[in-house]
Curated annotation (Swiss-Prot):
SUPFAM superfamilies: Subunit IX of photosystem I reaction centre, PsaJ (SSF81544). Belongs to the PsaJ family. It is a single-pass membrane protein. Signal peptide: none annotated. This is Photosystem I reaction center subunit IX 1. May help in the organization of the PsaE and PsaF subunits. Keywords: Membrane, Photosynthesis, Photosystem I, Thylakoid, Transmembrane, Transmembrane helix.
């Protein structure tokens, strides 16, 4: 398993970008699931 992380294709830009975007989307989704009011807070006048 650890040898997988040392391979050249795993450190390439598309793979790193895909993992980064997936983690960011997951964090945003989970944050909005637990604190949904902050999603619409700036829109309330």
């Amino acid at each position: 398993m650890f040898q997988l992380f040392r391979t050249k294709w795993f450190r390439s830009a598309p793979v790193v970008a895909t993992i980064w975007i997936t983690l960011t989307a997951g964090i945003i989704v989970e944050f909005n699931r637990f604190v949904p009011d902050l999603l619409f807070h700036p829109m309330s006048f």
